[in-house]
Amino acid sequence: MSLNRREFIKTNAVAAAAATAGMSLPAAALAQAGSPPLQVRWDKAPCRFCGTGCSVLVGVQNDRVVATQGDPEAPVNRGLNCIKGYFLSKIMYGADRLTRPMLRKKNGAYDKNGEFTPISWDEAFDIMAQKWKQALAAGGPDAIAMFGSGQWTIWEGYAASKLYKAGFRSNNLDPNARHCMASAVVGFMRTFGIDEPMGCYDDIEHADAFVLWGSNMAEMHPILWSRITDRRLTHAGSEVHVLSTFEHRSFELADNGMIFVPQTDLAILNYLCNYLIQNGRVNREFVEQHVNFKVGATDIGYGLRPNDPREQSATSNGYPGADGKPKGDPGAATPATFEEFAAFVSTYTLDYTARLSGVPAEKLQRMAELYADPDKKIVSFWTMGFNQHARGTWVNNMIYNVHLLTGKISQPGCGPFSLTGQPSACGTAREVGTFAHRLPADMVVGNPAHRKIAEELWQLPEGTIPAKVGLHAVAQSRALKDGKLKCYWTSTTNNMQAGPNINDEIYPGWRNPEAFVVVSDPYPTVSALSADLILPTAMWVEKEGAYGNAERRTQFWRQQVRAPGESRSDLWQYLEFAKRFKIEEVWPAELLDKKPEYRGKTLYDVLYANGVVNRYPLADVGVVNKHAIDGYMNDESQHFGFYVQKGLFEEYAQFGRGHAHDLADFDLYHRARGLRWPVVDGKETLWRFREGYDPYVKQGEGVRFYGNKDGKANIFALPYQPPAEVPDQDYDLWLCTGRVLEHWHTGSMTRRVPELHRAVPEAVLFMHPDDAKERGLQRGMQCKIASRRGEVFASLETRGRNKPPRGLVYMPFFDEGRLVNKLTLDATCPLSKETDFKKCAVKVQKA
């Protein structure tokens, strides 16, 4: 690459700016400031990291990503990136990138305790098929399972769901989004009868105030935080309220920062409702027209194993009782009146709530006045503080209570907004339905009508999809440990580091001699190194993909470069693996008798070469994408001989079109910077459920929550309850886990970026200085953190970005050398089955 004098000066200016910021940029990225580098091709793609859905421009030179930059045409991020986004060009080029399948072998044959040995894809699929067939023959569909991801592309998740739920006839498929978004899903479904936020990011520029509940947006959603910051600093009267169990960077902008005792957010939400009612600030007209009241089941347990005393004493956890029958239903609810709801929340007075939560009364009252003010437009944001909660579904329902009582919902600048942590937790896990109980477009396996729709669209005989809900994430780990699962395939996730209670419930199952565990991953993660077979996987722009972000925006990208060595995409893996099974090997004879024409065919033939998925010819790949890359082709389509991604997407889209989950035509997404569904007549929807914005709300209806048959939303009466585990004299501190700005989740990508690793090389334990002093600890000292389940060692930090109150410590989970999830409890919300990573009891002492 040659530069003229002017370009050389620009390059040096950019390099100097980067050095000042502590960044090093690829040479090609420094070629010019304000214009693309020479000989570099640029194309759009959504960011690989969080659920915000920023768009970036990807610079490619000689089949290598050499630079990325914020996409100035992107409505989400408007040309900005966070620190992780600036280094996207480096995530695929770690020195230890896997390029060949690796099987544990001893003396030339598979051995559970053998050493990882490179093998061919044929050998990998041969042993996988052998193990899966043995498991299916001996234990049926219940003996196999898959753990997927909110980082799957839309068509990867859809193909995996077809393979398991239709092909293997097993609903034992669950995503790692179970650990982060399941409570939001169940909360939406219980209140509105339909999933995902009713608003969009445009709410930020319309709102007067923002309330953060268990969300450190400054670090976890920094681009959205920049938009909130701009609104706060430029809009007169704008306010930011932040609630958390510890102080973090979002508090720097807060007008009203509140630190509460873990789990008492339940009481605070009820106090807000009580305040609205007692002070006559309920929007009675809205409530009477659009709301029903219900009382939820309460003694629901904590999602622990059935033999745990906390579950044995619970009366409505759904577990088998002494008579073998389920003990109630944790999701049950009975109708109530407004007056009954008012009486229920009346005990949550200001004084009681302040004492219980530890939040000063004047701070609670200020927030209550904000919600009560009819002239204030408010957006409530939350993430894992709400969702990773033993009552996660409840707190989601309860924030909706507040917005429904005030009518501050489904209009510009007003609404409850659940943020996502993964790039396609919405688009893949939720919309495609890769949860153990779901099908696409909010359909569920337990509903016969929904199964019928899926079977017809997939051209399956009636009865193919089982009605039995499969194993959720935590249940999968327990089933592996108990020997009930024999074959397990995980992809695009790192549960051996990210899952709860690793020592007791995850590692023993993976190393169970009866289990065969496969991990698809680009890097040798903790999970990969604990498996029996590792499949090297293509990353991000090494394949054509699609993600769906937190505001219902579906975004596509084109393959930009080839994956290294023998790495293959997850999509390629699922379709190729399907070729190893004849229908007769996986379906019972009585089912096959209903479709005798399928005899002799493979699962690939029936699921993916079915005349629908394979109807778009290979030539379409170039035609659809000619506007961006002349002569474009992607590896999967080239291999299978048709436009695989388009065929899968268009079949999938049939589930939602006409059912308020409408997706646009495939080709349109490759031109757009994403579209927010429902997309009807080519027009996206910004605000749902309100006339004038939502095509599914008819003229004259005003507001209609059409997910429920009567068009009304539900307000739930739900109490404060303590968590499953609280500090005591032996384990005297609360532990909260989470992330940091510089790393994403378990760090399998970001820790391989030198600049990000140098910025935060290891996880530290954040502690209040007085708690440290009381224990004879000093900043920088190595300490031991122990719970009833395990122990880890980390350096102590008493300053910095996170400032816990006395009695609580905080530790991020990105560091594979300090596995904080050895400490956490595998308690879950009994409704959503999502893990509570935010509270357990630990003790800290000198190492």
Curated annotation (Swiss-Prot):
Q: Which residues participate in Mo-bis(molybdopterin guanine dinucleotide) binding?
A: 84, 151, 176, 180, 213-220, 244-248, 263-265, 384, 388, 494, 520-521, 543, 570, 737-746, 821, 838
- Cofactor note from UniProt? Binds 1 [4Fe-4S] cluster.
What Pfam families does the record point to?
Molybdop_Fe4S4, Molybdopterin, Molydop_binding
Q: Where is the 4Fe-4S Mo/W bis-MGD-type domain?
A: 40-96
For this entry, list what GO says about its biological process: cellular respiration; Mo-molybdopterin cofactor biosynthetic process; nitrate assimilation
State the SUPFAM superfamilies in the record: ADC-like (SSF50692), Formate dehydrogenase/DMSO reductase, domains 1-3 (SSF53706)
Localization: Periplasm
The record's keywords, sorted A to Z, are: 4Fe-4S, Electron transport, Iron, Iron-sulfur, Metal-binding, Molybdenum, Nitrate assimilation, Oxidoreductase, Periplasm, Signal, Transport
Concerning InterPro entries, the annotation shows: Asp_de-COase-like_dom_sf, CT_Nitrate-R-NapA-like, MoPterin_dinucl-bd_dom, Mopterin_OxRdtase, Mopterin_OxRdtase_4Fe-4S_dom, MopterinOxRdtase_cofactor_BS, Periplasm_NO3_reductase_lsu, Prok_molybdopt-oxidoreductase
PROSITE patterns hit by this protein: 4FE4S_MOW_BIS_MGD (PS51669), MOLYBDOPTERIN_PROK_1 (PS00551), TAT (PS51318)
Q: Which cofactor does it need?
A: [4Fe-4S] cluster; Mo-bis(molybdopterin guanine dinucleotide)
* Binding, substrate: F813
Q: How is it modified after translation?
A: Predicted to be exported by the Tat system. The position of the signal peptide cleavage has not been experimentally proven.
The keyword Ribonucleoprotein belongs to this UniProt entry's keyword annotation: no
Kindly give the CDD domains that the UniProt entry links to this protein: MopB_CT_Nitrate-R-NapA-like, MopB_Nitrate-R-NapA-like
- Kindly state one GO CC term assigned in the UniProt record: periplasmic space
How does this polypeptide assemble, per the annotation? Answer: Component of the periplasmic nitrate reductase NapAB complex composed of NapA and NapB.
Per the record, the similarity remark reads: Belongs to the prokaryotic molybdopterin-containing oxidoreductase family. NasA/NapA/NarB subfamily.
> Per its UniProt record, what HAMAP family does this chain match?
Nitrate_reduct_NapA
Protein name per UniProt:
Periplasmic nitrate reductase
Annotated organism of origin: Bordetella petrii (strain ATCC BAA-461 / DSM 12804 / CCUG 43448)
Which gene specifies this protein's sequence?
Answer: napA
